[in-house]
Amino acid sequence: MPLRIIREDLTKIKCDAIVNPTNVNLVPGGGIDAAVHVAAGPDLFTACQRLGGLEVGQVKMTPAYNLPCKHIFHTVGPWWEGGHKNEKEKLQECYRNSLLLAESLKLKSLALPLISSEIGRAHV
């Protein structure tokens, strides 16, 4: 899968899947997560509740509903605490697990935002 860096609204990208940085309870939060939930519609909230939560670095998938992509990969990035609690490794897990899921599904395109860069304050 070739790499391309773009600046675009994640909720408007036509691709196989987008990665949605969320929280451990998969309830609409702020930042990208809020925008994804608004654009996808109320069915996304129901689907997220069925997933039963996430751990930091874990990735789970839902349909994209009203988004132009096919799937949403939900992941929880680490909260930056000075770099002393394996935040770098946990952040790498978010990206690695997203890419591994995309590969297992044989996806051709995946839109990845900067995870934990807004609310989690990670140094990326």
Predicted regions and their residues:
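Conserved acidic residues
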Residues: 16, 70, 108
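N-terminal short beta-loop-beta anion/metal-coordinating cradle
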Residues: 4, 46-70
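Short, basic/glycine-rich phosphate-binding loops at helix/coil junctions
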Residues: 67-81
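N-terminal and secondary-structure boundary signal
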Residues: 1-7
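Phosphate/ribose-phosphate-bearing ligand recognition and processing surfaces
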Residues: 79-121
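Short, conserved "active-site rim" segments that organize catalytic pockets and cofactor/ligand binding
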Residues: 8-52, 56
